[in-house]
Amino acid sequence: MTIAKKPLVLLIMDGWGYRPNMPDNAVANANTPVLDKLCKDYANNLLSASGMDVGLPDGQMGNSEVGHTNIGAGRTVYQNLTKVTKSISDGDFFDNKNFVDAVDQAVAAGKAVHIMGLASPGGVHSHDQHIVAAIELAAQRGAKNILVHAFLDGRDTPPRSAAGTLALFDEKYAQLGVGRTATLVGRYFAMDRDNRWDRVEQAYNLLTQAKADHTAESALAGLENAYARDENDEFVKATVIGEPAAIEDGDAVLFMNFRADRARELTYTFTDSNFSGFERASVPNVHFVTLTEFADDITAPAAFSSERLTNTLGEWLADHGKTQLRISETEKYAHVTFFFNGGVESEFKGEDRTLIKSPSVATYDMQPEMSSIELTEKLVSAIKSTKYDVIICNYPNGDMVGHTGVYDAAVKACEAVDSCVGKVVAALKEVDGECLITADHGNAEQMIDPVTGGIHTAHTNLPVPFIYVGRNAEMASGGRLCDIAPTMLNLMDMEIPAEMTGTPLITLK
């Protein structure tokens, strides 16, 4: 006979930070009666989700990869941004074997060194100082033809802010006497993660064929031309800068993004012999190196290997015979699976996964509810099945709509999530289950840039909510994302592994 389980559900409201009420605060100004009542009736506090508390440099805003990794690990996990930056300051970066080998082979054959990545100081997917260091490394190794392919941000940075980074690159070329920016394209095309191969194809054709609708004599001129076409950084269409310079056989290609989820698709176009996303007109045989490990099935060498996290929440639950479900939309599916499991692709024993397809719209302000209704239906069904001990669910709306910078849409996104939370809590009460509600980082609570007065599309470094909907309890003040997993295990009356250095925050009365 199957024993009915009383599930503990962790709801992660992506991009939902806490900020005192302001006119541009979509979270506070949204009509959220469910969450308002939960905060009134149940134990709750705020958690730190940025900076050193999640393994990032002081003051650095959190992000979804970092947030989910810390939540799932139950400990502060020092992030790739921190590791790579330290290796540059220590000098170890310039002796990195995989980078050096690729560059040296290209130099010996008189070929080019291509450096591509998100040209941004945002620190979420990349950092422009890492690209500068790669330019320096190539120059030190004797490269005479260093070509930078700049993917423009405007999502983790202000919408029209790329000029500073492009000027930084120009200064470095002038200082070294070698190198130039060869192409520009917005991250909308180069960094898709939802199998929108028509977008990726445009970036790939720019890189491998120098195929573009636009040209310019300099990177800054190309950027200004894009702005004149009313294209913000994220959406800049493929642009060739100066003499066309496509990636060719024998060249070295260094992909300088450190975050995996939005780097995988473009990497597959270069490295997967069975690639079928689109017909590739050119498939150059290159020395391709990624900055970090993007996926188990990517064969290209990585300059920095991933830290193996043992006894994450998912692994610990599996080892103790517990069942678990991970569920989200396409946009955050990798976060509740791969990142939550500490970079492990495969499911643990007793772990099921449910993927709900995100809507096919150009930008999510066009459909701020995204696929939350279908997601909630599947989640409620899973709760009522009493099959699972633990369910991890991510609602992407606050983050994905917050990134558009459209305030009214962000308000609607928050209201949609609130309605869904109400249905989840009602289902849990039917089966005597419990719920923890939190976020991985902030976003929608700040929609106007206080400096420029323009729209704010980036994450914030503000705290996030933590609500316990369950038994009568007290909540400790303070806390970090890494405290969530130990808190969950404590609520389940389970031992906490030694590797989890987070602190349980809830005391049952």
From Swiss-Prot:
Cofactor note: Binds 2 manganese ions per subunit.
Coiled coil: none
Biological processes per GO annotation: glucose catabolic process; glycolytic process
Catalytic activity: (2R)-2-phosphoglycerate = (2R)-3-phosphoglycerate
Residues forming the catalytic site: S64 (phosphoserine intermediate)
EC number of the protein: 5.4.2.12
Residues at which Mn(2+) 2 binds: D14, S64, D440, H441
Keyword GTP-binding appears in the UniProt entry: no
InterPro entries the UniProt entry points to: Alkaline_phosphatase_core_sf, BPG-indep_PGM_N, Metalloenzyme, PGAM_B_sf, Pgm_bpd_ind
TM regions (residue ranges): none
Pfam families tied to this protein: iPGM_N, Metalloenzyme
Keywords on record: Glycolysis, Isomerase, Manganese, Metal-binding
Cofactor (UniProt): Mn(2+)
Quaternary data: Monomer.
Family per similarity comment: Belongs to the BPG-independent phosphoglycerate mutase family.
Function: Catalyzes the interconversion of 2-phosphoglycerate and 3-phosphoglycerate.
Protein name: 2,3-bisphosphoglycerate-independent phosphoglycerate mutase
